[in-house]
Amino acid sequence: MATNEEAPKTENGVVRRVVVAEDEAVIRLDIVEMLREVGYDVVGEAADGESAIRLAEELRPDLVVMDIKMPVLDGISAAERIAKARIAPVVLLTAFSQKELVERARDAGAMAYVVKPFTSNDLVPALEIALSRHAEIAALESEIADMTDRFETRKLVERAKSLLISSMGLSEPEAFRWIQKTSMDRRLTMREVAETVLEQIGSKK
């Protein structure tokens, strides 16, 4: 089945890399073919959950497409481990749509859920949603980490200022300017300067 769809790509123009895990070889072959026809690069195939995890860790794909019912380790357990390791978003496939399975898949960290039988028109939107959700979560986590880092830096600078005020007799603006100037002169971050002040002056107190 030929397609004129543009290949799904990352922001830098690289084709999306996918690992497919499905214990039934014929179905796995169909999924791989379906993905390749719409432009995904299938970089690894697995027949059980443990193999899927190993491939994901080794290949670091953009996406993992995985059946729920598999030997050795089921897809939901494998998805949970892949999600916890923050390797890639996982899309789970299943022949069942019970509420309990959907909830387990969600709790495991799966980004999307597709019920068999499906066509590329069902699968591709789920993959794109999973990639989009994963990117949003990663951006949010990065923003939170950045905010936390800024808050910690501010606290360290405040503590360093207090030490400079008490040990060098500087005013608060002078102490801040001293940290700022030292940071620029020595090509260090203000956090690094503050940590040095706390370590060197603080240890003498």
Give residue ranges: language-model regions.
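Active-site residues of response regulator receiver
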Residues: 67, 94
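Receiver (REC) domain active-site loop signature in two-component systems and cognate sites
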Residues: 61, 70
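C-terminal output/effector regions of signal-responsive regulators
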Residues: 134-136, 142-205
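C-terminal output helix
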Residues: 100, 118-127
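Short amphipathic alpha-helix used as the core "switch/output" element in two-component signaling
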Residues: 54, 76-87
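Two-component/phosphorelay signaling modules centered on CheY-like receiver
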Residues: 24-44
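Acidic catalytic/metal-coordinating carboxylates
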Residues: 48-51, 72-77
